Amino acid sequence: MVGQASPRGRPGNVRRVKDGFDSRGMAALSSGHLATDLAQGSLPALLPFLEAKFDLSYTMVGALILVATFSSSIIQPAFGLWSDVRGALWLLPVGVSLAGIGIAFASIAPSYGLVIVGVLFSGLGVAAYHPEGSKFASYVSGSKRASGMSLFSVGGNIGFALGPLVASFFVITLGMGLDGGVFVALPGLLVASMLLFAIPHLASFAPAQMEVRAAAAADQWGGTLMLLAIVGLRSLAHMGLFTFIPLYEISRGNGAAYGTRVLALFLFAGALGTLVGGPLADRIGRRKVLLGSFIVSPPLIATYVLVGGTVGLVALFFAGAAVIGTFSVSLVMSQEYLPGRVGVASGLSIGLAIGLGGIAALSLGAVADAVDLETALLCTALGPLVCIALTLLLPAPRYRRPAGPEPAPAAAI
């Protein structure tokens, strides 16, 4: 087909769609996101068993999350830059495979040091997948990018929520212990095979070079830096709760299985919030959605920690929807602030969220060791509080990219 992008994802001359998004491309990208984040999301469910096996302190538990988050975050902008300059659709199947294989290795590692190695490689797989995946999710979304990105993001949300349940099924329900963690790799390997066949179709959505150059002139680094500060502070709540909910429920006298179910509730609520947040942002504006979520999050978190019981679980559900549900909104905003560097914007937005979340996990682990887990969880509410002021200062984006390109006819792919 004349003008079609190469399978490597190089920009080409392609036709435009009007308003909709390509369901075939989105299904492939969201499935890969689900499998990648399922592997990453399984780690907290394994932490109580790793803690018991290697007699870990809370700080050492937090260090595992730090390794996972740093390895999956620091290198993301580099992958995004590679994507913007040369195209790197091959990162999609490679990343999702490595994410699962790393966790599988960590679950059967004979020492704490080798657990760290497995977690490290899993994080690199996560880092490889996200910039390219979110970049092409934007391309296949048409003009409703927040809505489209919410569908891509909800794949990750569901993966995070399924991760603890899948790991617990093999580790606890089937009584396999940590050896059951090897099965976490299976979804990623299956989805990687599907992504290999989807690459030519996805490549047809890459924008023309002329459009990329025009968009680069509108890059807003000031707005980007302010948004990244918001993303980092939001991670204090997101990753802090994500890491310590299971351990907090155990400290309350509940079992490990119950703690895993509470974590799944938090994450599934985030998936629902994502599905609502994207379309709502397209309708009423990105900043209004961010601001509303940051206003309601602190009291909801405090209610979960201080009240507990059914009321606490309901509060945690809505906290998950508010905190996690704005992820797709901030991701689209980062791409709108850097329209000529969509891969870099995606890598910075996702990478910083993960990386600072790891620092938050380690810091909150130290607070839990020095004081208690309740105090550490209450500290997670501070991030959204600061985000309220920063959100009010966010500028409007100067550039709006045209609706994404139309895919080639099936016979030409």
Tell me the role of every PLM-derived stretch:
Residues 152-200:
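Helix-loop-helix hairpin linking two adjacent transmembrane segments in secondary transporters
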Residues 185-209, 388-395:
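C-terminal membrane-cytosol helix-exit motif in multi-pass small-molecule transporters
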Residues 55, 87, 108-113, 142, ...:
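Helix-breaking motifs and short loop linkers at transmembrane-helix boundaries and internal kinks
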